[in-house]
């Protein structure tokens, strides 16, 4: 947007797509799948200077995101003081509402209206992925979906005779690219970059008497939705998606925010009074972004990258060097048995020095109890990498 405003470029085409469902079907049907390699970077490329996770996290949680987000979810559940059963129902009802929206979305991938119990209760069709998340809590990236949008100046739109009815205006955006491994974040559920980027948008809205009334909160996993909702101070009862969310509408990898933005622009075209706020995430709730849209150019567009501010104020917590000792659990999950490992718990703790450590447990009684009562906040003993 800033490049268009400055005259550096006249227009930009933003495209995203995913054909993973086609790839999946080719595998199932033993057919060849042809994939075109992308060997060049986009014009604007932000390369991460830090890793998404530390070695201990990768060793026990792997590279899939679900375990990391499940640990964040446990921390948020404890912060909200919800019991295990209350939390199951809360997430089930939130995502049941999402499924209803996806069912009426002509572009939605799963157009089925689920009851909250269908989502909350694990079974063969909705297996546990990482406690407390079942399959229907998780983003669905096995989709065939594509989307595109064009950004240009009013001057070019006039030259091309683009009808006013089709024009939507970006009002403001913000982002943070500050990276801290999940376990090293001072506050697991309130990262500073998220707070600063959200505050920038909220301040613009407050100063200009703009009130967002339509939301699309990034929904790779339920904890992301809740963290965005809290940061934006959204009142209970508001719809938090226009697509139906990534579990049901579809979650094409690396391009969902384009899809969700296009859907938001359609919503604003159909109802000119809507002011839309779209959010995005990268990594393990590592980076966040916000974009504010409206039918009219209510204010001059502005953007802020809060990365440097966040880097200066939020530092990673040290990893514990203790081989044996006591600690307090700050988050946990239980991963189901897979091809390479048995069912196990992955536990984040803070030791008596205030440093962080990743622990594991294979104790079946502990694993069972972790799904029945809250373990966040418990004082525990450890030896090496194991819960003692």
For the regions a protein language model found, what residue spans apply to each?
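Conserved "HGTGT" condensation-loop signature of ketosynthase/thiolase-family condensing enzymes
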Residues: 2-156, 162-249, 266, 280-282, ...
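A conserved active-site cap/scaffold subdomain adjacent to cofactor or substrate pockets
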Residues: 249-257, 268, 273
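Active-site capping/gating regions of soluble enzymes
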Residues: 276-278
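C-terminal capping/lid segments that line or modulate ligand- or cofactor-binding pockets
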Residues: 287
């Amino acid at each position: 947007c800033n490049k268009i405003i400055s005259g550096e470029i006249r227009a930009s085409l933003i495209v995203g797509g995913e054909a993973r469902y086609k790839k999946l079907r080719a595998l199932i049907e033993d057919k060849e799948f042809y994939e075109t390699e992308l060997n060049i970077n986009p014009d604007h490329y932000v390369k991460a200077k830090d890793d998404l996770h530390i070695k201990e996290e990768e060793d026990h949680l792997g590279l899939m995101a679900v375990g990391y987000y499940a640990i964040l979810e446990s921390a948020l559940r404890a912060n909200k003081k919800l019991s295990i059963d209350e939390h199951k129902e809360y997430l089930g009802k939130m995502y049941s509402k999402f499924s209803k929206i996806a069912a009426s979305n002509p572009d939605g991938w799963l157009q089925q209206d689920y009851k909250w119990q269908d989502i909350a209760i694990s079974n063969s069709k909705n297996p546990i992925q990482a406690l407390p998340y079942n399959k229907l809590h998780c983003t669905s990236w096995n989709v065939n979906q594509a989307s595109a949008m064009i950004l240009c100046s009013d001057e070019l739109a006039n030259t091309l005779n683009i009808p006013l009815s089709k024009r939507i205006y970006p009002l403001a955006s913000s982002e943070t690219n500050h990276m801290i491994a999940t376990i090293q974040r001072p506050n697991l559920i309130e990262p500073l970059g998220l707070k600063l980027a959200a505050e920038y948008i909220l301040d613009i809205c407050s100063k200009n008497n703009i009130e967002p009334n339509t939301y699309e909160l990034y929904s790779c996993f339920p904890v992301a939705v809740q963290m965005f909702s809290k940061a934006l101070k959204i009142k209970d009862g508001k719809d938090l998606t226009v697509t139906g969310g990534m579990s049901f509408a579809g979650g094409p990898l690396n391009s969902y925010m384009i899809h969700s933005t296009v859907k938001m622009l359609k919503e604003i075209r159909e109802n000119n009074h809507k002011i839309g706020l779209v959010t995005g995430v990268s990594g393990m709730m590592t980076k966040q972004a916000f974009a504010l849209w409206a039918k009219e150019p209510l204010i001059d567009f502005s953007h802020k990258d809060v990365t440097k501010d966040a880097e200066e104020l939020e530092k990673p917590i040290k990893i514990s060097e203790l081989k044996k000792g006591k600690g307090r659990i700050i988050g946990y999950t239980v991963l189901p048995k897979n091809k390479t490992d048995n069912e196990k718990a992955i536990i984040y703790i803070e030791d008596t020095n205030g440093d962080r450590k990743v622990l594991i447990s294979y104790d079946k009684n502990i694993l069972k109890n972790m799904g029945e009562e809250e373990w966040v906040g418990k004082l525990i003993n450890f030896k090496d990498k194991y819960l003692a």
